[in-house]
Curated annotation (Swiss-Prot):
It comes from Neorickettsia sennetsu (strain ATCC VR-367 / Miyayama). It is found in: Cytoplasm. This is Peptide chain release factor 1. Belongs to the prokaryotic/mitochondrial release factor family. SUPFAM superfamilies: Release factor.
Length: 367
């Protein structure tokens, strides 16, 4: 920790500067007051952690002198040894917490996300699994008190989802969900299986950070917007007005279709939101490729690796192949959205790999 004291002192000094600055009348009246207040609030828990650590180190130094002092009363020295041991047990945990605090943060962690779930291999069973995953994330969002807004759902004939999209907003949504991207696999006996055989199906999950409006500039001249009547299953028209919207981004060829709303205006707004997310993801991927060597130690960067997680219903087991984590609470996870233990394990493992500087890729191909 000795080599980190300079960094910790910088944090303390910055916090002191901000406190003084925010007390100035001219700062309160300035446009940067909100920005300074936010930075001050973000530094506060870090400063409290550093202060606690410094206090313990001072107590440790005092007790070390106390227990070594031959002139001190023996009973006092024994009490000092006990107190010293308690402090020595706590300090390594605090040091780890401080190191985690100093890890570089993903600038997108605080952003809301666009969730995309698509049925993969496995026909109708894959579509049913995609629906289960979508509802799992919806339940998890409820647990986290996030807002879950369904953008669009494409059903199949038996109630499964060919594709489903949702916007999730709240506190640190991308930080929590970014490791969910990838191929999810299910092993279970389909309802339509009369012989009781276990089938394996897949669904892909993509978690894309939603940029702020200022992060993505879209020129109107780069867009081709078509409107038409929305259609339901089988292609029949379900609306008498041209409410469906198809937006084509000419430079990239990205096409977004939105027809869930009865209002053309609402469909256009949703389509533009999806387009903005996809354009931001393209730019984000470019940046990630440029710094890929720095990210090798992480759990994943949101790429769709083959076999991220397996849900084995006959055994009641969920296995995350990236960190060899197995849990036997499959119903609580899938049906009730109890995802937090898995997500926290992924975050902690990612932090551990970053702290250790271990250059390991994340292929997700372990069985």
């Amino acid at each position: 920790m000795d080599n980190l004291w300079g960094v910790l002192e910088e944090i303390l000094n910055r916090h002191t500067y901000l406190a003084d600055r925010l007390r100035c009348p001219e700062a309160i009246a300035s446009q940067e007051f909100s920005k300074l207040s936010k930075e001050y609030a973000e530094l506060k828990p870090k400063v409290e952690l550093i202060a606690r650590y410094k206090k313990l180190k001072e107590e440790q130094a005092y007790l070390e002198l106390l227990v070594k002092n031959p002139l001190e009363d023996q009973e006092i020295r024994e009490i000092g040894k006990s107190d010293l041991q308690a402090i020595q047990d706590v300090i390594p945990k605090l040091e780890l917490e401080i190191k985690r605090m100093l890890l570089p943060k993903d600038k997108d962690d605080a952003l809301n996300v666009m969730l995309e779930v698509r049925a993969g291999t496995g026909g109708d069973e894959a579509a049913l699994f995609a629906a289960s995953l979508f509802h799992m994330y919806q339940k998890y969002a409820e647990r986290m008190k996030w807002r879950f807004e369904i953008i669009s759902i494409s059903h199949n004939e038996i109630g499964g989802y060919k594709e489903a999209n949702a916007s999730i907003s709240g506190s640190d949504v991308f930080a929590k969900l970014k490791f969910e991207s990838g191929v999810h696999r299910v092993q279970r006996v389909p309802e339509t299986e009369s012989a009781g055989r276990i089938h394996t199906s897949t669904a892909t999950v993509a978690v894309l950070p939603e940029p702020e409006d200022v992060d993505v500039k879209i020129n109107d001249k780069d867009l081709r917007i078509d409107v038409y009547r929305s259609s339901g299953p089988g292609g029949q028209s379900v609306n008498t007005t041209d409410s469906a919207v198809r937006i084509t981004h000419i430079p990239t060829g990205i096409v977004v279709i939105q027809q869930d709303e009865k209002s053309q205006h609402k469909n256009r707004a949703k389509a533009m939101k999806v387009l903005r997310v996809r354009l931001y993801e393209i730019e984000r991927n470019k940046v990630q490729q440029e710094i890929s060597s720095m990210r090798k130690s992480q759990i994943g960067s949101g790429e769709r690796s083959e076999k991220t997680r397996t849900y084995n219903f006959p055994q009641g087991r969920i296995t995350d192949h990236r960190i060899n984590l197995t849990t036997y609470r499959i119903n609580e996870t899938v049906k009730e959205g109890e995802l937090e233990p898995i997500i926290e394990a992924l975050i902690r493992e990612n932090e551990a790999r970053m702290l250790a500087g271990v250059e390991v890729g994340f292929s997700g191909d372990k069985s």
